[in-house]
Amino acid sequence: MPESLDIVHYVDEHFGEKILSEQVRPEIEAWLKEVGSYYGHLTTARFTQIGLAEFETQSAIDYFTKKKTEFIGDFAENIAKTETYLARLKGDLEKLAALIQSGNALSGKLSLEDIIVFPVLRNLTCVKGIEFPPAVLAYITNMAKLSNVPLYFDKAI
């Protein structure tokens, strides 16, 4: 992600008026660290199964699976542990809901928090059974509209 953030910084600074706050609250950093410790176990194995263009060929699926299992373990085992991860995520999503200050931006103003957190939440929409708190669901939906990025609810497994 560091390279992606470098691109975000460059575009924000060089094209038009700067709009992103660089502030990331410590509570958001802590939330990302906690959820980041396990969310790949929920999402990664599903990516090859939800019809994404990057996985149209078996060779792409095989390569991705080989590389990612080195980090998260067997895909089938991760899928089998979904309920365990969902139980953990439920509390973490409730913590995030308490930190959301606006449906259009976590801190009330578009910031790096949104650039970092929205992709995590978007990826979680590929997991069937997640109960997003209303504030989190509103945020995900609004950010998807603002960024013109589709969510995976209709493909969730």
Language model segments and positions:
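Alpha-helical oligomerization segments
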Residues: 130, 138-157
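GST-like fold's C-terminal all-alpha helical module
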Residues: 35-141
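Short, hydrophobic secondary-structure boundary micro-motifs
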Residues: 19-23, 106-109, 151-155
